[in-house]
């Protein structure tokens, strides 16, 4: 095996710099841009991951506000300090959260907990109080409260919360839940 000493390294660097100088500015910019793209790719296909949250206007009356925030199991306490341990014990692998606004009046939040197995989502759902709730047809099992809705589907547990109570908001929560449910089978992130 050949060892490179400092003289050889200097010669290689000199040759590299001479080659770069022969290229035009535009060509160097293209090389740098292509290298940056190649280094920055995070998915195997190069495609952006599918969002589990409906975009603004996908569900009537709902507009997504802000960026999706992601928490792994280790950092979940930053989002739900005091209750994170319950989700960790149930096998949460990732939590996604996004803010929404309903009919440009009511703020809300959608939380999607991706569990390592469906039994984890079922465990969390079963610990949610059924008091003052009614069952609704969303996912594998769902409960609608005055200003919130929880449901589970496969390995996902979803919590929607609106910061106002009304029958219109309750109906809106069901529609948003169905919008999220339709995306859960797509394997997004």
Where are these regions (language model features)?
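Short, well-ordered beta-strand segments in beta-rich or mixed alpha/beta enzyme
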Residues: 111-114
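Bacterial N-terminal signal peptides
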Residues: 27-38
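N-terminal low-complexity, intrinsically disordered segments
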Residues: 116-139
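Short, surface-exposed beta-strand/loop micro-motifs that present aromatic residues
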Residues: 95-101, 145-152
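Solvent-exposed loop/turn segments at secondary-structure junctions
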Residues: 116-120, 143-144, 157, 164-168
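N-terminal "mature-domain start" segment
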Residues: 41-107, 131-135, 157, 163-189
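Short, surface-exposed coil-to-beta transition loops
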Residues: 106-109, 144-146
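N-terminal secretory signal peptides that target proteins for export/translocation
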Residues: 1-22
């Amino acid at each position: 095996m050949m060892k490179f000493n400092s003289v050889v390294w200097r010669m290689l660097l000199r040759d590299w710099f001479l080659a770069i100088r022969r290229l035009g500015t535009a060509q160097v910019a293209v090389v740098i841009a292509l290298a940056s793209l190649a280094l920055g790719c995070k998915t195997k296909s190069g495609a952006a991951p599918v969002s589990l949250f409906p975009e603004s206007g996908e569900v009537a009356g709902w507009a997504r506000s802000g960026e999706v925030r992601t928490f792994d199991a280790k950092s979940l306490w930053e989002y739900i300090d005091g209750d994170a341990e319950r989700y960790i014990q149930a096998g949460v692998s990732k939590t996604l959260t996004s803010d929404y606004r309903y009919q440009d009046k009511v703020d809300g939040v959608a939380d999607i907990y991706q569990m390592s197995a469906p039994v984890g989502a079922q465990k969390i759902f079963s610990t949610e109080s059924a008091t003052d709730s009614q069952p609704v047809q969303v996912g594998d099992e769902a409960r609608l409260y005055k200003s919130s809705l929880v449901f589970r589907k496969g390995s996902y547990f979803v919590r929607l919360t609106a910061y106002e109570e009304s029958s219109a908001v309750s109906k809106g929560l069901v529609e948003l839940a169905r919008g999220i449910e339709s995306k859960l089978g797509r394997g997004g992130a």
